[in-house]
């Protein structure tokens, strides 16, 4: 990305889409060079087969919340996987759809109801504060887990670096403590540089969470390694022994081929989520809900949206995805 455009998330996202072939080729090379095992999945079925070949039934696994893991239905693929995202845990416990990654749907929910859900998640009774007890339990489960499964916010293809951005710190636990880390990334999350990736991440948080940046960043460049022990390189000393990355297509190439790629500019800020929920009466809601996930889900579900519903829809987008772009992608 040229210097003049570095602070323009729309231009960054446009270049990511336009250069997707080049970025994919570069990502495969640089990730592999850093010791990651790279897998290409053309659809959710291929992703499921890869994950099931890695995570056997008898292996313990934790996961964080991400659009890709929801897209492929990680809970169905790995039934024993344990969710660690606090807001997702509460949403599931309350029977609510966690459709906005930046804002949990807890309107008109009492603190007592949330407390009950977290108490049910917690395995043992302790005197310590509830959130601290849940956090400690997640760390203990991570120490015993064979796999930590996450999505990711970006891959900087020039260095082969996986970037995670979050507020809770649980993604760091899931990606760093278990013996092996598996990250699932949509092809649209490939960036040419760290600067471009961070600008898009910041734009997502500013527009979705209304804050300048997330609390935690994790940079993962291959499996953990250290040369501190007698000058010999040792893997797995301060993190996972192996890092696997699944690069997921699952309809993204179809949108590109049909010239419907503008929705892939989406940075998952969630600004459009409340407006799009009006479309979802009677339909299964993609989680998180945004122009990209709705368009990808539509390739399979073929949502029937009335003209009146289109006329009532209104949203603003920081990367200028328009109603016309969304409507074109849904045709």
Question: Where are the predicted features?
Answer:
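Short Cys/His-rich zinc-binding micro-motifs
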Residues: 266-267
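Ferredoxin-type iron-sulfur electron-transfer modules in oxidoreductases and energy-metabolism complexes
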Residues: 201, 235-263, 273-274, 278-331
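Active-site-proximal glycine-rich helix-loop-beta segment
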Residues: 270
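The feature marks the mature, well-folded catalytic cores of soluble enzymes
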Residues: 1-259
